[in-house]
Amino acid sequence: MTDTAENQTPNDRQAGHPRSIRSFVLRQSHMTAAQQRAIDTLWDSFGIDYQATPADLDARFGSSRPKILEIGFGMGMASAEIARRLPETDFLAIDVHGPGVGNLLKLINENHLENIRVMRHDAVEVVKNMLQDGSLDGIHIFFPDPWHKKRHHKRRLIQAPFIAKLLPKLKTGGYIHLATDWEEYAQQMLEVLSSFDSLQNTAADYAPTPDYRPETKFEARGKRLGHGVWDLVFKRIG
């Protein structure tokens, strides 16, 4: 779900950083009139513009409920459903894919969801500059681009340097939940998360899919192709 498009906010295109890890892929895509209308009319209520200074998430949401960061949400269907299932939890959903941003805003409005805020920016920069240490109760990264060719593995999001940046943002007792339909990437994810002494696997290796996570289009696609799906849930213990 982090296999996304143009890195721009609704008001301003952001510069790329090709030599660093990014949470997205630059691709052209078509935005429907309904998606654009959702951005135009709902962004002020549910969108958060990027800033290079720490943000007060409780103030942005208007609540002190637990906060979950979601990196990459595709077209937003799973994000909206998770928020519907967990109304007492706030979700900060980040993606750069314009149609997906518009579609998630549309779903937020249609389902009367008050516990999601949306950002359209590189999640790596958001994590680095906007999120305060200890501000998150959980992190969801579902079906990031597997970059299946070996020469492209260095572009994968789930690498030790990025996890090291995420960990300080997570409260002790908070969790990281990853999911992929690419077995070799699942093995890499397991190795990366297991390498951190401050993270504890909640399962022997791969976890049962938690009840809150619905089947995504990426998961359905993988099953059609005969792929398995692997969930990993690690808890911060220190």
From Swiss-Prot:
Substrate binds at K149, D181, T216, K217, F218, E219. It catalyses: guanosine(46) in tRNA + S-adenosyl-L-methionine = N(7)-methylguanosine(46) in tRNA + S-adenosyl-L-homocysteine. Pathway: tRNA modification; N(7)-methylguanine-tRNA biosynthesis. One of its GO terms (molecular function) is tRNA (guanine(46)-N7)-methyltransferase activity. Keywords: Methyltransferase, S-adenosyl-L-methionine, Transferase, tRNA processing. Gene3D superfamilies: Vaccinia Virus protein VP39. The active site is at D145. The keyword Magnesium does not apply. One of its GO terms (cellular component) is tRNA methyltransferase complex. Residues 1-20 are annotated as: Disordered. Signal peptide: none annotated. It is an enzyme of class 2 (transferase). PROSITE patterns: SAM_MT_TRMB. Coiled coil: none annotated. InterPro entries: SAM-dependent_MTases_sf (IPR029063), tRNA_(Gua-N-7)_MeTrfase_Trmb (IPR003358), tRNA_methyltr_TrmB_bact (IPR055361). Its EC number is 2.1.1.33. It comes from the Bacteria. It holds the Pfam family Methyltransf_4. Belongs to the class I-like SAM-binding methyltransferase superfamily. TrmB family. NCBIfam families: tRNA (guanosine(46)-N7)-methyltransferase TrmB. HAMAP family: tRNA_methyltr_TrmB. This is tRNA (guanine-N(7)-)-methyltransferase. It comes from Neisseria gonorrhoeae (strain NCCP11945). The gene is trmB.
